[in-house]
Amino acid sequence: MANDYLFTSESVSEGHPDKVADQISDAILDAILAQDKYSRVAAETLCNTGLVVLAGEITTTANVDYIQVARNTIKRIGYDNTDYGIDYRGCAVLVAYDKQSPDIAQGVDRAHDNNLDQGAGDQGLMFGYACEETPELMPLPIHLSHRLVERQANLRRDGRLPWLRPDAKSQVTVRYVDGKPHAIDTVVLSTQHSPDIDLGTLREAVIEEVIKPTLPAELIKGDIKFLVNPTGRFVIGGPQGDCGLTGRKIIVDTYGGAAPHGGGAFSGKDPSKVDRSAAYAGRYVAKNIVAAGLASRCLIQVSYAIGVAQPTSVMVNTFGTGRVSDATITRLVQEHFDLRPKGIIQMLDLLRPIYEKSAAYGHFGREEPEFTWESTDKALALAEAAGTEPVAALAE
C-alpha cells in the first residue's frame, strides 16, 4: 500500500431502517435470554412503511410478547409519529417464527451441561481485528463515523436540534501517511429532518454542532470537505424511505472495511451461533494482542464446522508489526484463549440479555460494561509470556 493514501468508512444511526431491524431482532433475543438463557434464537426482522415482519427460528421455554417488544424498540428509537412513516402505536406487526431444525440442534444441544465440546451451530469463518489508531484500538474512520451518528442521535433526543429525525448516515475519509492517520479529508453526514428547516440552517448546524465537536483537533489540517445532506431534502427516511432488514450492515457493525468479514451477521442470533460469538472472540483476542504490545495491528481468522467444537483453523496476521513472530502469537492464542463455541460463551459470559445495545453504533470499540469482548484482561499474561511491554493505558 502506498505511503500516502485515503481510506473511508461509514456508519448509520439507530433510526436507519436496517438498524431498526437489527435492534428489534436483538431486543427479541434479549427478552428471550432474560427468561431462558439456553434458548436457540435466529430472529430476523423486516420493516417497511407501517409494517414490521418477525420471522426466523426460535426454540425456547420463554413466554415473550414479541409484538410488544418490537413496538417498544421502535418507540425507543424515536419513531413515534405517523409523519415519520412508521409509528410504534399504529404499525402492523406480523409474527412468523418457527423452531430450530432438529438437524441443526443435534450438534449443539448439549448447552445445559458442562461439556465444552458443544459443537458449532454452523460452519463459517470469522475475523477479529485491532490496531493502535484509537484508544479503543479501533480503525479511526469507523470510530469517527459511529461517533458522528451517535452525536446526531443525542442532539435529537435532548432537543438541541429539534428538527432532526431518527434516520442518518455518516462517512469519514482519513488521509494516512506511513500507515498512520494524518488528517481528516472528507466528512459526509446525511440526516433526516423535519420539512420546515431550510437547508442552509441545517448544514451550518450539523457542521458546527455534530461534526466539528466529534473530530480530533490534531487531525483537522487544511481544508476538510464537509458534505451535509448533499442531495438536499431528506424528509422521507427510516423504514418509509427504504425497507429495513436484519443483517445488512455487517461492515458498519465491525471494522468499516479495514479488516475482512466472514459474511455472517450478528443481530438476532444467540451465542451458540459462531457467526456472532466467534467474531466477538476474535475481537477479544486481537485487542488483547495489541494491548499486550505483541503487535500494533492484528487480524485473526477462525473457522468452524457444524457440530464440531474445535476450530478448523486459527490464523494470526500482524502485517509486519509484530514484536514476536505470527507463529508465536498463534501459539499464545491457542494457549490463552478457549475458542471452542462453549468455551467462548463461558469466557465472555455471553448467555445474558446484553445484545440490543450492540445493535447500533458498532459491536466493537465501545467501552460498555456488558461488552466483555472489549476487555484487555489477558494483556498482561500475554505480554509476560511473549516478553513484551503492554500498552500501559489498556492492560488491566
Swiss-Prot record:
Keywords: ATP-binding, Cytoplasm, Magnesium, Metal-binding, Nucleotide-binding, One-carbon metabolism, Potassium, Transferase. One of its GO terms (cellular component) is cytoplasm. Pfam families: S-AdoMet_synt_C (PF02773), S-AdoMet_synt_M (PF02772), S-AdoMet_synt_N (PF00438). GO terms for molecular function: ATP binding; magnesium ion binding; methionine adenosyltransferase activity. It catalyses: L-methionine + ATP + H2O = S-adenosyl-L-methionine + phosphate + diphosphate. K(+) binds at residue 44. Mg(2+) binds at residue 18. ATP binds at residues 16, 167-169, 233-234, 242, 248-249, 265, 269. GO terms for biological process: one-carbon metabolic process; S-adenosylmethionine biosynthetic process. Binds 2 divalent ions per subunit. It is an enzyme of class 2 (transferase). PANTHER family: S-ADENOSYLMETHIONINE SYNTHETASE. This is S-adenosylmethionine synthase.
